[in-house]
Amino acid sequence: VYEIFSMPYLFTSEDAYHEVMNDTDYMNKIFSSTDEQGFRALTWYNAGTRNFYAKKEIDSPEDMKGLKIRVQQRPASVAMCQAFGAAASPMSFGEVYTAIQQGVIDGAENNELALTSNKHGEVAKYFSYNKHQMIPDLLIGNLSFLNGLSKEERKVFYKAAELSNEEECKQWDVQVKEAKKVAQEQMGVKFIDVDVLAFQKKVKGVQESILKDNAQAKPIYDHIQKVNKKYEGKDGE
């Protein structure tokens, strides 16, 4: 069920992303859907918006043609990259710096923190806000462990998870702001606002393929599209 969150442009704005993920009643239905597999997500953490960054400027999908881009080892990410005309190069994240530096790849995709925490801003000077994915991190709990807790212990455990979500989301915004400042002022990275809709149009086929192969994803997709519509025209799209 969680594969749906790898779909490019599942969320079309950060406002929609946060509204869906903060809808506790709705998300608990998704979290509990894996009970039969013996685990359950307890809460989510913001991992930001994934964007392309490279050694050359990317202003439109056409600029990606022929580029070699490191993506996550997920079918949706590989298919997305190919839809833009680029060559997807799945590899360990720890190899990205050297691969860009040596010209093995032209760029990668991630949030702003990759530029500073992993020093990718030293070798990739252009960061384009195409906002192709918003994939949450999840806190996973073993169901046997959770069911073994007393009522009071369970209450405390879930409250701690809730508080950790609130604090992480606050700190995330602070860290992104700081990373962008460091990347611009100390690394010389150029941040580029692009026509997000132009990128969205290129991956319609990828979205349709994901929905076709995953029946569980369709209701979640439909729900998120309703929320997306509430924020059309906002958040830079």
Locate each region found by the language model.
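N-terminal secretory/targeting leader peptides
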Residues: 1-17, 25-26, 30-237
